[in-house]
């Protein structure tokens, strides 16, 4: 794994493809290896998300992010009147990332893809699909044009969708009713 990590740091897409090819030639692939691939894909897409052009809703999200220092936590959250989880995270992230918009976008995009990957791997394991099919599903999700394009313009909605899917996967597959996850999705 160290070699693939180095390749990923040198050239992310090459590291991801090399690791996927390596996994594809194995007789058996562990869940840990599939999760590692999902993390690599999510980090790569998180980095790509920071390069998106500021248009439409994406520009509005940036303006809202830059408004954080104008108010206290509750004043900021209440000034929008909706999506308290998103604006609470925005407020905290502003200070956590020292006002760096790109780190904020990176965190949301990466989290979105990590959640989608979690869902794919959970469903794949539940259905007992081959690891090759799970790898293909991860790549399809990661490089599906409409999903990546929508993430920039509909950052909040994409994250809410991913959180909702994670809630449903936990509910139907793990039989765990994690209502706090559903409430997070509603608050985004």
Where in the sequence are the language-model features?
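Hydrophobic alpha-helical transmembrane segments of multi-pass membrane proteins
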Residues: 51, 103-111, 142, 151, ...
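Membrane-interface alpha helices of multi-pass inner-membrane proteins
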Residues: 178-188
């Amino acid at each position: 794994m160290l070699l693939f990590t180095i390749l990923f740091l040198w050239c992310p897409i090459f590291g991801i493809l090399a690791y996927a090819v390596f996994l594809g030639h194995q007789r058996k692939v562990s869940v840990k290896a599939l999760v590692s691939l999902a993390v690599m894909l999510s980090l790569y897409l998180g980095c790509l998300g920071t390069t998106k052009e500021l248009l439409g809703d994406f520009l509005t999200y940036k303006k809202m992010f830059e408004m954080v220092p104008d108010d206290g936590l509750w004043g900021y959250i209440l000034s929008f009147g909706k999506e308290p989880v998103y604006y609470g995270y925005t407020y905290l992230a502003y200070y956590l990332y020292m006002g760096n918009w790109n780190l904020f976008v990176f965190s949301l995009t990466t989290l979105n893809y990590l959640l989608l990957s979690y869902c794919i791997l959970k469903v794949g394991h539940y259905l007992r699909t081959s690891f090759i099919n799970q790898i293909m599903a991860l790549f399809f999700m990661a490089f599906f044009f409409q999903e990546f394009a929508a993430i920039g313009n509909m950052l909040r909605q994409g994250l809410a969708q991913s959180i909702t899917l994670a809630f449903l996967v936990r509910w139907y597959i793990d039989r765990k009713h994690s209502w706090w996850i559903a409430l997070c999705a509603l608050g985004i």
